[in-house]
Amino acid sequence: MKTVLLVIKVFLLASMVLSCATSSNAFREIDHAVDQADFTAAVDAVVRGQRGHRGQRGSRAIYTERNAISLFMDKGLLEHYAGNYAASSEDLQNAERLIEEAYTKSITENFFSFIINDNTREYPGEDFENIYLNVFNALNYYNSGNTEGALVEIRKLSQTGGKLDMLARRYDYTDPETGASLNDIAQRETGIRDLPEIASVNFSNSALARYLGALFYQANGNIDSARIEFNQIELAYRTNRNIYRDSVPRAVEEARNVPAGLARLNIISFTGLSPIKQEQLIAHYLPFRHPILQVAFFKLPVLVKRPSVITRIEVAVEGAGSFRLELLEDMGAAIEETFSGRFSSIVQKTYIRTIIKYAIADITAMEMARQQGELAGLMIALTARTAMDISESADIRMSRYLPDKAYIGGINLDPGTYSVIINYYNGNNLISRDTYADVVVDNNGLNLLQSVNLR
């Protein structure tokens, strides 16, 4: 009896910790500002959502101490969209630092999370966040006039041993001595034979990162490195079919071969909002003796799409013509692909944790039924199951303001100054328009115009 009471107390304590979990409703103010493309107001709303901010009650804080990575990611992205590149760079660098530190956290904290719930530890960040923060920080550097700094960010992703290279291998780990996979190791350590398998991740090359790298190398006069990056775009399309389902955009080849005497105006546009995590209940049969404990409901984080209303983007350059932007990278698909490996790991960990909890409860309930009757056993089983269900919640923390898609296009022009209009359509209906006056197009450097529409 003392054992089950102790177990229940632990689970109820965990439920108190998790009761402050943030729901998507808490982000309404930020989401509204983003929908209105008022990114400065969105940043202000994020700041108000920090724990400890003046006037913000701790129990209502959106970004707690355990969710610092999401804070820096959200704030850094929104600062970028608002054109505050220095502030954005600082925030994204903080997010990157915390993600790196999360990999080296003590095994004690990880063990506690293993027994209770992922929400009991600091949010470690997702693989896709660790990748795309470098893309946007590269654009921060470029927009601040620092092309070399932009290339440093891109090389963090693309070089041998970089983030994309490591991601491709992380979930295909094998023990160098025994050749055991992650699944084999988990089964050996837990003794549970029917564990869900950890999926591999097929995202080892980013056309978006390669495209930006090629343009930055061109701007620095490093033609050979630019050639390699352009070639890597084609390789990314061939080897990552879950993400790149169409042919390489024509704009890639056009940017690669600009006629002598002309200057290239390149356009990159980010649209929509990437998928976000939501909690999903999944029922699963467990082979325990007490009927109350034979069905468990796993609470798992699943990605849910946020469809964009934008179906077409057209660019008009005054006196030079118009062209349509082409999809370069489905960032939402890349996010889903990179999350698949982590999701499998989460399912496996949740499964193990649930088995352990229910096994303790089943043993205690059956023993109580034997000693004091079926009603006593039923009460123990019901109480334990309720406590366990309360103690569980899916970890839905993540960055909410990554774009869903990246489009590119461009036009070869005589060097000069132009007016540029970017039109966003839903079918034949004009949704919004970005106008850029006095755009200087020079044949001695990179002419990259960036637009964002997250609707």
How would you name each of these model-derived features?
Residues 32, 71, 78-79, 140, ...:
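Residue-level signature for tetratricopeptide repeat
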Residues 16-41, 50:
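Bacterial Sec signal peptide processing site at the extreme N-terminus
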Residues 157, 175-406:
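Extracytoplasmic/secretory-pathway proteins
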Residues 54-66, 99-110, 161-172, 234-252:
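Boundary/linker segments of alpha-helical solenoid repeat arrays
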